[in-house]
Design a protein with these regions (language model features):
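Flavin (FAD/FMN) cofactor-binding and adjacent substrate-gating region
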Residues: 40-73, 221-243
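Flavin (primarily FAD) cofactor-binding/catalytic cores of flavoenzymes
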Residues: 2-36, 40, 78-179, 183-387
Length: 387
């Protein structure tokens, strides 16, 4: 290991794509993390909101796509795509690209002269000339104020559960109104829980008529990346272009693309199965007799056994406490996101971010698997040019 080594922290789609592109340019690279760990912890019976065409983990030759996997294993296109299918594809991708992944987690990341010092949880240390942080969304669950001081026995985030069997016969409130909230509510019902979903705004079902009924012409409205409403999705598909528009316009587009909304295929699993209370929020939650007493913004109250938060994620650099405080303080930020240049490089030279943490500059595509290509290509070009 030398100062020419690039370290990648995270072995999800973005970390894997970056490592594959660096390998193609013969850049010495170490990647740390458990491959697809976040995805493997999801309930196995889940389906994904992303479409088949937008679930490709990027590689330099575009050879290891979900289509290629499907043809190899005689798997027809799925709508929706099952989580199990995506995980099988990801495993096949790993077998093709042959990355040497160290499944040890990083304990600390600090500056060391012009490079970086990485300490691993097993006590080993590594020197690196460049570091890519590709940690996905798992470190960033959004926890509402009312829930921050409640014990994990009474409140949990949707990402905490690989199944909901423990809630059979329990009264559970799901907070949220997007895909994760509705899918959690559906799985809770199927596990035998009594469920109510409470969302602070209206319930929005994604309207896919233009996508479904225009045949080949759908590509006029939607690129293969398929993030956001018709038309806007073409701008979102090009993160380097997105980066160049004004802050105000970027924020407006981002809100339109990632607003809480539910995929239409989930409708048959949820309608009539549980109570939905839209345009309402929980004002206060207090422990009472092994459960929770809830006060709602509409003046009503509830007594429940547990709350599941389907409230999404809020990426912030400061949440990544393994980054040395002195290093974190040097990273220029905007509302918690690192401010990045065209190479996905932060204000600290040779420190890069991809995935959800890149969304402020490069847009909502960074929150989805389909966005893994742009940072991988840019990082590989920038690093290779500097060696």
């Amino acid at each position: 290991v030398t100062q020419e080594t690039t370290v990648i922290i995270g072995a999800g789609p973005y970390g894997l794509a970056a490592a594959t592109h660096l390998k193609a340019k013969n850049v010495p690279t170490l990647i740390f993390g458990k491959p697809l760990d976040f995805w493997k912890k999801m309930p196995p019976e889940m389906f994904l909101k992303s479409t088949w065409a937008s679930l490709n983990i990027a590689d330099p030759k575009n050879a290891y796509t979900l289509d290629a996997f499907g043809k190899k294993h005689q798997i027809v296109k799925q709508d929706p795509v099952a989580l199990k299918t995506f995980l099988s594809y990801a495993q096949w991708y790993l077998e093709q690209v042959k990355l040497d992944i160290d499944q040890t987690f990083v304990k600390t990341l600090a500056q060391d002269g012009k490079g970086f010092h990485v300490e691993l949880e097993d006590g080993r240390t590594v020197k690196a000339g460049r570091v890519l942080i590709a940690t996905g969304v798992a470190p960033f669950p959004c926890i509402p104020d009312f829930a921050k001081n409640l014990p994990s026995t009474l409140v949990s985030h949707s990402q905490d559960h690989s199944d909901f069997l423990a809630f059979q016969g329990k009264k559970v409130v799901v907070v949220g109104r997007g895909q994760s909230a509705f899918e959690s509510a559906a799985l809770l019902c199927e596990a035998g829980a009594e469920v109510e979903l409470i969302g602070r705004g209206p319930i929005v079902w994604i309207d896919r008529r233009l996508y479904r009924y225009t045949g080949f012409a759908k590509r006029i409205f939607y690129p293969p990346s398929d993030i956001g409403p018709a038309g806007i999705s073409w701008l979102v598909a090009f993160p380097q272009v997105f980066r160049r528009i004004s802050d105000q316009r970027r924020t407006s587009i981002d809100l339109r693309c990632v607003r809480p909304a539910v995929a239409p295929w989930l409708r048959s699993r949820v309608e009539g199965r549980f109570t939905t209370t839209p345009n309402t929020s929980i004002v206060e939650a207090t422990e009472q007799a092994g459960g929770l007493d809830l006060k709602l913004s509409n003046g009503e109250t509830r007594q429940v056994d547990h709350i599941v938060l389907g409230t999404g994620y809020q990426p912030e650099v400061e949440t990544l406490t393994y980054i040395d405080p002195a290093l974190r303080s040097q990273v220029q930020k905007y509302h918690g996101y690192p401010v990045l240049n065209e190479w996905f490089e932060a204000s600290v030279p040779h420190l890069y971010f991809s995935g959800a943490l890149a969304a402020y500059n490069f847009g909502p595509i960074c929150r989805f698997v389909t966005g893994s290509g742009a940072p991988a290509r840019q990082l590989a070009r920038h690093v290779a040019a500097g060696l």
